């Protein structure tokens, strides 16, 4: 059996800690939270400082424009700051006939918004617990009635709709509902797919805690080479590209294709002698 490769950087870090002497480990999560609490809102005088780089403010995207123009007809209820995140993560699907699932139909307006945004050929699947939402079915839009907190409902759902491109959870907003939905649908996203969960509110939110734990998997390491530094990705790292956090919103992106290795090669010929890593 091949001996496991040492993580030389971690070995050196542990050695440096030992040299400083034993100290009680601080609660890093609490420290990070406290650091965020210490930020004050900018005063008017601070806002008047000249920025280091001047850029034009971003123009409203198509989704924001659709929302602002929706003065009549089926209702759309969204936080305005969501639209920038939508455009950032979902623009790649425009014109590519994606299969989109939105949990939480409510008054139906967002179904039409997604249909207009993604363009001809997209398939929109709205999920809601209320039978009245069947009224919003139509061309390219299917309505499925069910309880998003029920794993049995999702088991039947993925038998019908196995491969998904986009999931937007705007459903009941309870952590147990959000977790059940994520665990059922995140694995069903195609390569490059995007999972968005809205309305993750409150600093002591259980779905937020769940995502904190989920994100730790991105930092797993199984070293297979020191020169060049190479890590064999875990199953999670192979399939999940990134987890993004915004006020009240979480976006998870699947990798465009399975990742074979995580590698840190050295480029260049001149190196300081104080670090003799790979």
What are these regions (language model features)?
Residues 2-166, 172-197, 201-278:
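A short alpha-helical cap/connector motif
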